Amino acid sequence: MTKIYTLTLAPSLDSATQTPQIYPEGKLRCSAPVFEPGGGGINVARAVTFLGGKATAIFPIGGATGEHLAALLADEQVPIETVETRDWTRQNLHVHVAASGEQYRFVMPGAALTDDEFRRLEEKVLTIDPGSLLVISGSLPPGISVENLMQLVKNAQQQGLRCIIDSSGDALAAALDVGNIELVK
């Protein structure tokens, strides 16, 4: 069976809550938050695990939010490989407004990665067995260029990994230029 790995460069700890209504400048009383792991590749690994398969999620992790994210994935029995980062893992906020049924999604930028942190993530990728599937999904964090990502993809392909890219904009166009991608979304 093909081994599946995911790479998420901008993981998140997603929190969701509900409030009766939203209005400016007042205190908005909310329900107790619900926390879930987030980020493109992490969501892929969660789905594979939920369906009875096995996918290892590779991602950077920092601070208390990163620890909480890792604990939630452990609760779901999703295997992880992480690289400690200086910056805390981002936390997003989803708010459901009961009166209107509307949902507001506040998405923070991913934690910036240093060159060394990115290099350590790439080293983890390059230890994956040839023939394995690598799903790279999610947004790019500050400090990581499309060129950095495409070089990682090329190195992974040279290692014998089959790559799937789930991205948008410049990263998606660059993935098409790299070629030999199993699937692009």
Annotate each language-model stretch with its function.
Residues 26, 50-132:
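Conserved N-terminal subdomain of the carbohydrate kinase-like
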Residues 7-11, 60-63, 85, 98, ...:
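Cofactor-binding loop segments of dinucleotide-utilizing enzymes, especially the Rossmann-like FAD-
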Residues 23-24, 74-76, 99-101, 152, ...:
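Short, hinge-like loop/turn segments at secondary-structure boundaries
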Residues 10-12, 88, 109-111, 139-142:
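Short glycine-rich anion-binding loops that position phosphate/pyrophosphate groups of nucleotides
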Residues 1-58, 67:
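Glycine-rich phosphate/adenosyl-contacting loop at the front of the ribokinase-like
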Residues 133-185:
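Conserved beta-alpha-beta core of the PfkB/ribokinase-like small-molecule kinase fold
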Residues 3, 54-56, 79, 161-162, ...:
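Residues at the starts of beta-strands that form the adenosine-phosphate
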